Amino acid sequence: MTTTLPAYDEVVPRYEPVIGLETHVELGTNTKMFCGCPTDFGGAPNTRVCPVCLGLPGSLPVANRAAVEATIRIGLALNCSIAQWCRFARKNYYYPDMPKNFQISQYDEPLCVDGYLDVEVNGEPVRIGIERVHLEEDTGKTLHVGGATGRIHGATESLVDYNRAGIPLVEIVTKPIPGTGAMAPEVARAYVTELRDVLRSLGVSDVRMEEGSLRCDVNTSLNPPGEQWGTRTETKNVNSLRSVERAVRSEMIRQASVLDAGGRIVQETRHFHEETGDTTSGRSKETATDYRYFPEPDLVPIAPDPTWVAELKAELPELPRLHRRRLQQEWGLSDLDMQSILNAGAVELIEATIAAGATPAAARKWWLGELSRRANETGAELADIGATPGQVAELQGLVDAGKLTDKLARTVLEHVVAGEGSPAEIMAARNLEVVSDTGALTAAVDEAIAANPAIADKVRGGKVAAAGALVGAVMKTTRGQADAKTVRELILERLGAQG
């Protein structure tokens, strides 16, 4: 039976959404959570493994201190209380991606609890409660062969790569978020965006959603206004900020259509499809009882020294909200401008470019324009694109000095990125400097006027807009190395016209 889906703006007046988010963050440690295997991305399948992460009999885990420290720093940045005593637990389930048939996680005694993260949505502050931040190990990666787009449906066989098994993973769980109404999808996206920025500022993870180092599960439920919260569903592994927003919106619409038809919502996991924006049923949702948690007998409890925790708190960097506020005041930026910089990961690059002598506007122009475009085209990180903040500041200095036009500067920048030298060296070696010889420019202008008498007459007659064609002719003659403004002024002067 085909169900007609309601429009989104019809959902919220009749139902109140409650959302919650669970994010898994791969920590950027050198070794895995409970063994010494490297955590580098890639490598031939099943080559970065050992008896511990393969769960072989007789192997014993040892907790990674660097992962514990990173988790405490995350908890402090999220305003959590750090437990005086916590322990690991076994989460029991049978699936090929975890060869031990259990995952080492934390259950009733996590490392960090009861925090919050403040976000802004449409200029309105929203405080998101944090239930817990705990440590666990990642699973292996399953590849389904023969099915559609790598899914298990229709697959003829499944392969498992255990290189990822045992990588330190932090799970950050929000408290239920009611009362957001129609803004629920935007609130979800704002939370994940802010969390990503916090994690990036801490340097604990590269937080690349597209590579799986930041994975998000979205819980959604609806209830009629004033009534008990509804049954929630969990949309798994949403892998982009845009998809977080779309997944909440899609699930709200779907649940409303089920409730409108007199049906009931089943507690289950669902899969979000990027291409359609829809969710489809996965499996019934397990409860904690299904996993039969019990304390991990092979690991001692962790009792962070209060002095150590205090030192970590004192060493926290300036967090994104405070950083944005300071930069906006110093640079005169709008919220949108600041978010663009953060999304591009360009804050430090722009700050360094300004420190090297460029204006905030010029620094933003290059890093968010030409260099971001090139990074997107090549898939490189902006910081690894091949241009340094000092070179960008030097390039802008040549523009400000009238030695390069913006167009010529873009050409020079291409060669800078290619590693050919500094902007000044490239400008000289490739003869790209703006033509400043007045005699040569005047000759080029006179040539353009002589070659285009009809246009010249229009300009003499007061139609100065027609001078653009003459400017173009001069720019062609000088191979784009003349300053267009100077050329236009010279044309009007030669034709006795007023601009």
From Swiss-Prot:
One of its GO terms (biological process) is glutaminyl-tRNAGln biosynthesis via transamidation. The keyword Electron transport does not apply. GO terms for molecular function: asparaginyl-tRNA synthase (glutamine-hydrolyzing) activity; ATP binding; glutaminyl-tRNA synthase (glutamine-hydrolyzing) activity. SUPFAM superfamilies: GatB/YqeY motif, Glutamine synthetase/guanido kinase. Its EC number is 6.3.5.-. It comes from the Bacteria. It is an enzyme of class 6 (ligase). The keyword ATP-binding applies. InterPro entries: Asn/Gln-tRNA_amidoTrfase_suB/E (IPR017959), Asn/Gln-tRNA_Trfase_suB/E_cat (IPR006075), Asn/Gln_amidotransferase (IPR018027), Asn/Gln_tRNA_amidoTrase-B-like (IPR003789), GatB (IPR004413), GatB_Yqey_C_2 (IPR023168), Gln-tRNA_amidoTrfase_suB_CS (IPR017958), Gln_synth/guanido_kin_cat_dom (IPR014746). Pfam families: GatB_N (PF02934), GatB_Yqey (PF02637). Keywords: ATP-binding, Ligase, Nucleotide-binding, Protein biosynthesis. It catalyses: L-glutamyl-tRNA(Gln) + L-glutamine + ATP + H2O = L-glutaminyl-tRNA(Gln) + L-glutamate + ADP + phosphate + H(+); L-aspartyl-tRNA(Asn) + L-glutamine + ATP + H2O = L-asparaginyl-tRNA(Asn) + L-glutamate + ADP + phosphate + 2 H(+). HAMAP family: GatB. Allows the formation of correctly charged Asn-tRNA(Asn) or Gln-tRNA(Gln) through the transamidation of misacylated Asp-tRNA(Asn) or Glu-tRNA(Gln) in organisms which lack either or both of asparaginyl-tRNA or glutaminyl-tRNA synthetases. The reaction takes place in the presence of glutamine and ATP through an activated phospho-Asp-tRNA(Asn) or phospho-Glu-tRNA(Gln). Heterotrimer of A, B and C subunits. Belongs to the GatB/GatE family. GatB subfamily. This is Aspartyl/glutamyl-tRNA(Asn/Gln) amidotransferase subunit B. It comes from Salinispora arenicola (strain CNS-205). The lineage of its organism: Bacteria, Bacillati, Actinomycetota, Actinomycetes, Micromonosporales. The gene is gatB.
